């Protein structure tokens, strides 16, 4: 099913909020997300800002990774919920390149040549900033 960008964004935010709430985190939502900040979560060290990038992952024989593109945002973290093998997962990664456009790929399967060096496997990025 194809969703428009707004619908995907709302679905993604709700997935991330629900996950954080199951961890007993205090989650806040800005009145307006003009600056690319969708959520604010309280951590041990204060507050972290989150931008949510929903991904409609369609795993096929030829597609074995998820590409995430980030526009200029001041968010501390990027959270990307996606569905794989009937389970919803969330990729969390620190936004070290804030205020710049950039992209990152995450492998959802092991390469056929068993290469592991310099590959971002999604399962290495499942820990949220409150865990």
Where are the model-predicted features located?
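Mixed-charge (Asp/Glu-Lys/Arg
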Residues: 1-35, 40-131
């Amino acid at each position: 099913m194809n969703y428009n960008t707004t619908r995907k964004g709302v679905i993604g935010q709700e997935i991330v909020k629900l996950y954080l709430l199951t961890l007993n985190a205090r989650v806040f939502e800005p009145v307006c997300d003009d600056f690319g900040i969708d959520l604010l979560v309280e951590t041990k060290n204060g507050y972290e800002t989150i931008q949510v990038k929903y991904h409609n992952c369609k795993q096929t024989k030829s597609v074995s990774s998820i590409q995430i593109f980030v526009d200029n945002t001041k968010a501390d973290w990027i959270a990307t919920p996606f569905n794989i093998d009937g389970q919803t997962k969330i990729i969390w990664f620190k936004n070290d390149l804030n205020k710049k456009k950039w992209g990152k790929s995450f492998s959802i399967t092991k390469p056929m040549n068993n290469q592991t060096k310099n590959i971002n496997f999604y399962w290495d990025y499942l820990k949220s900033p409150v865990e």
